[in-house]
């Protein structure tokens, strides 16, 4: 298990390929992102790689992507979410010595953390910016563990999801007893998950 796993998913299959000649690597996350930005931005623009800058492992993920983008003619800016402001729905960097316009955004920062930023931070700009963005906030609806609760209302068939995902219920719908796993609607790395049979009385 690695943070994001973007570098590993892009590089490790190619390292392993000589040992498994019957298989061929498929996909390259960094290249796919690059190609998407190439369709929406001009050459040489600056891409902001937004992440939780206090976490070295998050920086490692962004550094991999930033290096790849720079190798292909872009300029990289490593930023915390509150390092960007918005002017006429365009992202602008506030970083000292790196001030100015930003041509694209790759966000590797949990959306539900944005409201915890300083009250002076205009994090709402991430929602309606015209700056080309990867991991747009609208995707949070699909990230929520509560999405299966509204599938029928949305009129979606989703045969693979329905076949593979265990039954999902809202906790407020009642007590379900043993055999259920309780998860926060939004979360990562297993935090906040509760399995009744595995909990100690203190927990």
Where are these regions (language model features)?
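Domain-scale recognition of functional cores that engage charged ligands
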Residues: 3-203
């Amino acid at each position: 298990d690695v943070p994001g796993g973007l570098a590993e998913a892009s590089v490790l299959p190619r390292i392993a390929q000589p040992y498994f000649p019957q298989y061929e690597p498929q996909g390259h996350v960094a290249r796919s992102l690059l190609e998407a930005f190439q369709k929406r931005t001009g050459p040489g623009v600056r891409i902001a790689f937004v992440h939780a800058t206090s976490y070295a492992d998050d920086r490692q993920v962004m550094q991999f992507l930033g290096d790849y983008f720079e190798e292909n003619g872009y300029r990289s800016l490593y930023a915390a979410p509150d390092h960007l402001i918005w002017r006429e729905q365009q992202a602008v960097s506030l970083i000292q010595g790196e001030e100015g316009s930003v041509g694209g955004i790759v966000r590797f920062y949990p959306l539900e953390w944005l409201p915890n930023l300083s009250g002076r931070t205009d994090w709402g700009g991430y929602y309606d910016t015209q700056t080309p963005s990867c991991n747009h906030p609208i995707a949070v609806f699909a990230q929520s563990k509560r999405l299966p609760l509204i599938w029928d209302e949305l009129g979606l068939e989703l045969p693979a999801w329905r076949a593979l995902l265990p039954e999902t219920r809202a906790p407020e719908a009642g007590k379900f007893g043993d055999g259920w796993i309780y998860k926060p609607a939004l979360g990562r790395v297993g935090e906040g998950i509760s399995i009744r049979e595995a909990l100690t009385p203190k927990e």
